[in-house]
Each structure stands twice: as C-alpha cells, then as structure tokens.
Swiss-Prot record:
Forms oligomers. One of its GO terms (molecular function) is DNA-binding transcription factor activity. Belongs to the MraZ family. One of its GO terms (biological process) is negative regulation of DNA-templated transcription initiation. This is Transcriptional regulator MraZ. Coiled coil: none annotated. It comes from Shewanella sp. (strain ANA-3). SUPFAM superfamilies: AbrB/MazE/MraZ-like. Pfam families: MraZ.
Length: 152
C-alpha cells in the first residue's frame, strides 16, 4: 500500500527516482512494472503497479465503443497509458506527452493513494491541498451520504 507525499525531482532526461521505501514492493509484487496515465479530473498523472493497472484495463474492456462518453474515457486513459520499468537505480522515465499533460517541470510530488500514486507539479499539488481543505471544511463533507458514518 502506498501512502504519504514525497517531494522528488525530475531530471534533465525526464526521469524520476521512486522513493526507496516503495521500490522493494514494486519489484517483488509487480516486477518493477508501472503503467502511467493521466488523471481525467485533475492535472496530474496516475502511476499504477502493473497488477493494479490490469484491473483497470479489465473494467475499460467492458465499456462501450459506441457510447461517446465511454469511448472518450477509454481514449484518454489508454491513449496516454505508458508502461515503464524501474531501472537499477529505482528510476522511471516519464514520456514527454505525460509530462506536458501534468505540466511537470523540476519539482514534483509523488502522492500515495493506497493502490496507486498521483504525480503532481509541486505548485499544483499545494494548490490542490488548499482546495481539498476548503472542501473538507465546507458542508459538502457533512452532506455526503457515503461519508455520513466515516470516522477517524
């Protein structure tokens, strides 16, 4: 399970180093294979260990190619999807179209989301956190049925 936020750097070749604490589980459970695609709701990337991505692909396979919305979702997620592999130094290469989509430059945030990671431009991440705090403070949280009995 992936949790926590890590500040990392994008090198001049477009690579990032996955933090050491995640490398062993990625290597042992997923042979170091990761699929990167776009988040369709935010300007960030999603990094799925290969076995998690295969579950997403199975869901996408069930979507209709004749329904415009479903086809659009498939095009975005699959069209941007790139499979990468951790190198010997725990790095992965982020393809240019993905870097452009998420406006990734030098400073990046890798954010664990249990079964996947989000990859954000550092400034966009800080702005997103502010927006999340606003949402949590608003009545939207109190009025959300699925969160009615959620307790920490």
């Amino acid at each position: 399970m992936f949790r926590g936020a890590s500040a990392i750097n994008l090198d001049t070749k477009g690579r990032i180093a996955i933090p050491v604490r995640y490398r062993e589980p990625l290597q042992l459970e997923h042979q170091g294979r990761i699929v990167i695609t776009v988040d369709i709701q935010s300007a960030c990337l999603l990094l799925y260990p290969i076995h998690e991505w295969e579950l997403i692909e199975a869901k996408l396979l069930k979507l209709s190619d004749t329904d415009k919305t479903q086809r659009s979702l498939k095009r975005m997620l699959l069209g941007y999807a790139h499979e990468v592999e951790l190198d010997g130094n725990g790095r992965i290469l982020l393809p240019p179209p993905l870097r452009q989509y998420a406006n990734l430059d030098k400073r990046i945030m890798l954010v664990g989301q249990l079964n996947k990671f989000e990859l954000w431009d550092e400034q966009a991440w800080l702005q997103q956190i502010d927006e999340c705090q606003e949402t949590i403070r608003s009545e939207e949280l109190a009025n959300n049925e699925r969160l009615a009995d959620f307790s920490l």
